[in-house]
Structures are given as structure tokens and as C-alpha cells.
């Protein structure tokens, strides 16, 4: 073969290879375009797409060819629904600890945030702690003076339940010095109260977006529950009070849908004074056990029909008194009037679960101070003035400080055909009781849930040695 023939032959081979490379490139482009169009056509479906991409690169005559394999795994996303309060409370034979954050003990060496008024609230993904921070950490000099409840520096945060609140694990929600929060199954509503005592404003958020505001109606410390609110079929109910803490005040029951007020009611029934309600849901109803800061050492109760969006109120009927401070227990209670006596006022946030023979009430062990905590089983305490204690379980011994307490329920626990009642106890440390050692006031938290079988005993105090902070 002469040189010219060799040249033509090699040129032909090169042209053939080039055409082959070009065809591969065109087919690769067509494949990618078709896959892209198929993805766009499927976007109107409710799919979750997981893609696994494998790239192999081959060099042919200085041309890079990418072979791409795409594996689509399509699963239909779970549909979200509004929470329906369609179960009764579970029977409880005792209480077990499900979380304890030991925040003050950790705070001796870690940057733990100063908080108070903590509570627990759940959603479809689990439960978290909520608390009002003071804009500082325990070891920070700004912690001096954090005994004050209402300042412009406070705000609501949430943290993993059982972990001490630090900057890195805290999720900011809203600015304010009084709060409540609850999940309706689709989104979370949060309310914070901010501003001056005589001209406060409540800000309402749904799914973290500001939806409305509520201006003071009595110009005297507008305030709300300091524990979770409750929702049913898209409607969330909140109890708010404005007015004197030591005489007649003005309480409203407000109904919200997606953070907007759809109805409000002035307090009805025989309760004289309402503050800091601890609410739970069951059987299309919401029951709130509250604080009478004016007269009653027996706790007022608000019963709310969520379908009718109507309520009534009375007092716990039992003569076993559960506010602090309080006089001695009475042999006969009163369903419609406050039980007074020395010491009586002012009070502390508390809770109860009212379920006929399955009724449990919480209270401090000391009748005069916020120390110790116990759970009392008092069948029919909500309806029978003669009801008495049948069981007692110590939660915090009387030699240790307690504080506020409140109820919560994981309504999304599908493992049970009933709602298991749960509660938390705030364990306050620092001022005023320990002013000898520190200038700050903060808390840790312990949370407990019901057990269907009898349990053992134990005390679960804060546990910090306050002198270590001196």
C-alpha cells in the first residue's frame, strides 16, 4: 500500500471513530433530557424521590464520555392530619421519670442558659422542652438580677428534652416574658407576651410566622399559661388573663385556627380567679387546672368543649388542697367557691389529671414554700367534696426546692389506645431562697409519665451544690 493509500485509510478510521463518539454524545444528551422531562412531569405528584447517581468516565480518542445511571426510589410522603382528641386518659398506677436535664449541675462549668417557667410540649416528631430565657448564662455577670420575671431581655426557646439549655442546642421562638405553645398536627402555634406591665402585647406565631397580635385589655400584666396549649381538629385553645393578681381580674378563653383568633369568651362559671392554667386534651375536650392567686388554695378548673367551642369553670371539689401556700386539708371540699385560710395566697402554677377513679393531683410537699413535690391519687377529686387520698408518690423530697409544675401529653404516640398523662416539675435554684450564695435565679427540669403498673420510689431533686457557685 502506497503512502497515499495509508493516509486515506487512517483518515477513514479516524472519521469513523469521531462519528461513533459523536453518536454516543448525542445519545447521552437525549437520555439526560428525557429523564429531566420525566422528572418535571412527575412533580405534581406527592412523591419523595431518592436518587443514586453512578458516573463512569471513558476516554476515547481524547473525547470524554460520561455514562450516567440514575436509580429513582419513589415513596409516597406521609400525609399530615390535624390532631383529633379522640382518646381517653390511660390508667395510671404510678409515675416514672422520662427526662431530667440537671441544668444547674452542668451550669457550674458549662455555658448553660438562665431560664425559668419551663414546660414540655410534643409534636408528631417527639417532645421538647420550652422555657423563657433571661438573655444570659449562669456564669455570666449578666445573670445578676435574673430573679425578675418581666424584662425586655427574655424570650422563648426550645431545647431537646433531657438536655441542659445551651446556646448551641437552643431554638429561638419569640420575644417575651410569658408564653404558651402547641402543635395541631400540621403546624405549631406559639404565643409570647412582651412589653410594659401596663401596656403589654401578645404576639402569635403559626409555623414561625407572625399571624396576629393581641393588645392588653385590662392594662395590668397580660399573661398566659406557661405550659402547653392544646389543639383539636385544627382549633387551638388558650387561656389568657389580664388584671390584678390579688383581686378581680379579666380572663378570656381564646380559640385559634392557624394562629388567628376565631372566637373568644370571657370567663364563665364559678371560678373567681384564673392564672397559669395547665391544660390537657381528651375525648374532644380540654381540661385546664389553674391557679387562683387571689383567694383559693383549691385549684380552679376550666372544662372546654372543643367541638362547641364553649367552656365552664368551677373549683376542684376535694378538700385536699393543692396550691402553695395553703392551709391544712379540709374534711369536705367545695366545688364552687375558693377555700381560704392562712396561709393562702399567693399561689404557684400546678396541675392535675381529672379522670373519675383515675384522678391524680400534684402539689408541693411543703404547704408554705415551693419545696418538695408529691403526686396524690384522689378518686373523683373533681366531682366529690368528700374525696380523699388513696395513694401518694414522692417525686422530690421535702428538703429540696421545686417550683412550677404542669401537664403535657404525647398525643402522637400510636403505641397506645389512650393518652398517657405526663407532667414536669421545675426545680428552681438561686434567689430568693439561696440569696446567700448567688445573685441569679434559674432552674432545671424533671419530667415524668404514667405507668400502667405499680412503680417503686425515689426522689429526683435538682442536685446542684449551690455553694460551688460562690
From Swiss-Prot:
Gene3D superfamilies: 2.120.10.10. Coiled coil: none annotated. It catalyses: Hydrolysis of alpha-(2->3)-, alpha-(2->6)-, alpha-(2->8)- glycosidic linkages of terminal sialic acid residues in oligosaccharides, glycoproteins, glycolipids, colominic acid and synthetic substrates. This is Neuraminidase. Residues 11-33 are annotated as: Involved in apical transport and lipid raft association. Its EC number is 3.2.1.18. Homotetramer. It comes from Influenza A virus (strain A/Seal/Massachusetts/1/1980 H7N7). The active site is at residues 149, 404. Catalyzes the removal of terminal sialic acid residues from viral and cellular glycoconjugates. Cleaves off the terminal sialic acids on the glycosylated HA during virus budding to facilitate virus release. Additionally helps virus spread through the circulation by further removing sialic acids from the cell surface. These cleavages prevent self-aggregation and ensure the efficient spread of the progeny virus from cell to cell. Otherwise, infection would be limited to one round of replication. GO terms for molecular function: exo-alpha-sialidase activity; metal ion binding. Residues 36-86 are annotated as: Hypervariable stalk region. HAMAP family: INFV_NRAM. The influenza A genome consist of 8 RNA segments. Genetic variation of hemagglutinin and/or neuraminidase genes results in the emergence of new influenza strains. The mechanism of variation can be the result of point mutations or the result of genetic reassortment between segments of two different strains. Residues 28-470 are virion surface. It is found in: Virion membrane; Host apical cell membrane. GO terms for biological process: carbohydrate metabolic process; viral budding from plasma membrane. It comes from the Viruses. Residues 89-470 are annotated as: Head of neuraminidase. Residues 1-6 are intravirion. The keyword Lipid biosynthesis does not apply. Intact N-terminus is essential for virion morphogenesis. Possesses two apical sorting signals, one in the ectodomain, which is likely to be a glycan, and the other in the transmembrane domain. The transmembrane domain also plays a role in lipid raft association. It is a single-pass type II membrane protein. GO terms for cellular component: host cell plasma membrane; membrane; virion membrane.
Amino acid at each position: 500500500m502506497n503512502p497515499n493509500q495509508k493516509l486515506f485509510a487512517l483518515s477513514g478510521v479516524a472519521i469513523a471513530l469521531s462519528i461513533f463518539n459523536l453518536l454516543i454524545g448525542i445519545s447521552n444528551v437525549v437520555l439526560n433530557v428525557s429523564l429531566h422531562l420525566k422528572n418535571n412531569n412527575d412533580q405534581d405528584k406527592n412523591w419523595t424521590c431518592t436518587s443514586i447517581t453512578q458516573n463512569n468516565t471513558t476516554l476515547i480518542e481524547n473525547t470524554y464520555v460520561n455514562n450516567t445511571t440514575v436509580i429513582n426510589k419513589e415513596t409516597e410522603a406521609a400525609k399530615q392530619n390535624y390532631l383529633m382528641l379522640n382518646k381517653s386518659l390511660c390508667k395510671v398506677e404510678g409515675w416514672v421519670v422520662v427526662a431530667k436535664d440537671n441544668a444547674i449541675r452542668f451550669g457550674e462549668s458549662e455555658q448553660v442558659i438562665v431560664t425559668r417557667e419551663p414546660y414540655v410540649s410534643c409534636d408528631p416528631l417527639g417532645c421538647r422542652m420550652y422555657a423563657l430565657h433571661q438573655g444570659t448564662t449562669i456564669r455570666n455577670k449578666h445573670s445578676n438580677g435574673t430573679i425578675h420575671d418581666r424584662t425586655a431581655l427574655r424570650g422563648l426557646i426550645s431545647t431537646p428534652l433531657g438536655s441542659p439549655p445551651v446556646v448551641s442546642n437552643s431554638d429561638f421562638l419569640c420575644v417575651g416574658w410569658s408564653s404558651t405553645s402547641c402543635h395541631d398536627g400540621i403546624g405549631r402555634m406559639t404565643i409570647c407576651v412582651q412589653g410594659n406591665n401596663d401596656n403589654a402585647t401578645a404576639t402569635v406565631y403559626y409555623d414561625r410566622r407572625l399571624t396576629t397580635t393581641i393588645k392588653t385589655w385590662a392594662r395590668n400584666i397580660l399573661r398566659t399559661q406557661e405550659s402547653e396549649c392544646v389543639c383539636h381538629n385544627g382549633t387551638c385553645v388558650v387561656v389568657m388573663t389580664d388584671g390584678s393578681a390579688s383581686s378581680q381580674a379579666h380572663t378570656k378563653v381564646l380559640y385559634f385556627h392557624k394562629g388567628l383568633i376565631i372566637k373568644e369568651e370571657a370567663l364563665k362559671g364559678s371560678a373567681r380567679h384564673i392564672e397559669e392554667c395547665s391544660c390537657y386534651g381528651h375525648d374532644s375536650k380540654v381540661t385546664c387546672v389553674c391557679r387562683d392567686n387571689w383567694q383559693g388554695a383549691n385549684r380552679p378548673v376550666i372544662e372546654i368543649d372543643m367541638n362547641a367551642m364553649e367552656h365552664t369553670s368551677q373549683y376542684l371539689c376535694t378538700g385536699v388542697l393543692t396550691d402553695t401556700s395553703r392551709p391544712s386539708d379540709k374534711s369536705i371540699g367545695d366545688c364552687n367557691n375558693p377555700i381560704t385560710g392562712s396561709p393562702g395566697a399567693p399561689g404557684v402554677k400546678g396541675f392535675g389529671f381529672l379522670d373519675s377513679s383515675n384522678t391524680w393531683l400534684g402539689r408541693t410537699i411543703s404547704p408554705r414554700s415551693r419545696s418538695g413535690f408529691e403526686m396524690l391519687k384522689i378518686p373523683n377529686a373533681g366531682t366529690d367534696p368528700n374525696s380523699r387520698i388513696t395513694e401518694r408518690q414522692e417525686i422530690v423530697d421535702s428538703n429540696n426546692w421545686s417550683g412550677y409544675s404542669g401537664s403535657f401529653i404525647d398525643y402522637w404516640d400510636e403505641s397506645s389506645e389512650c393518652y398517657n398523662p405526663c407532667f414536669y416539675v421545675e426545680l428552681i435554684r438561686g434567689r430568693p431562697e439561696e440569696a446567700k450564695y448567688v445573685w441569679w435565679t434559674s432552674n432545671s427540669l424533671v419530667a415524668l409519665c404514667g405507668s400502667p403498673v405499680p412503680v417503686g420510689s425515689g426522689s429526683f431533686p435538682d442536685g446542684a451544690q449551690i455553694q460551688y457557685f460562690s
